[in-house]
Amino acid sequence: NLYQFGKMIFKMTGKSALLSYSDYGCYCGWGGKGKPLDATDRCCFVHDCCYGRVNGCNPKLSTYSYSFQNGDIVCGDDNACLRAVCECDRVAAICFGENLNTYDRKYKDYPSSQCTETEQC
């Protein structure tokens, strides 16, 4: 769920999910359209696509099982849908961590009206 995703993001980046990623670029936050603006925004685009492939549970509300082991996020659900949601969140949190060096504050609170030319998953 979004709370668990936020904890993953903080663990991998040291940043608050709400303050740093909830309204960033064209894809970080609710919904999304346009072309990803940078590597961080692309992490969100890929995450949105991943959620779009999940069947059988609500990705934003479903509580899954995971842990942090040796700096890694480990998803631990037997339920296929919950495991898929966890994997979407895990990959995105790692992606944010890998792209911290290109995070650009100018894309925080970016106007959605500037997001055009939507990419397909």
From Swiss-Prot:
InterPro entries per the UniProt record, alphabetical: PLipase_A2, PLipase_A2_Asp_AS, PLipase_A2_dom, PLipase_A2_dom_sf, PLipase_A2_His_AS
The main place the protein resides is secreted
Q: Which Pfam families match?
A: Phospholip_A2_1 (PF00068)
Under the heading SUPFAM superfamilies, the entry gives: Phospholipase A2, PLA2
Q: In which tissues is it expressed?
A: Expressed by the venom gland.
GO BP terms: arachidonate secretion; lipid catabolic process; phospholipid metabolic process
SMART domains per the record? PA2c
GO cellular component terms given for this protein: extracellular region
For activity, the cofactor(s) needed are: Ca(2+)
Question: Per its database record, what is this protein's job?
Answer: PLA2 catalyzes the calcium-dependent hydrolysis of the 2-acyl groups in 3-sn-phosphoglycerides.
**Name of the featured protein:** Acidic phospholipase A2 PLA-1
Organism per entry: Eristicophis macmahoni (Leaf-nosed viper)
Q: What is the lineage of its organism?
A: Eukaryota, Metazoa, Chordata, Craniata, Vertebrata
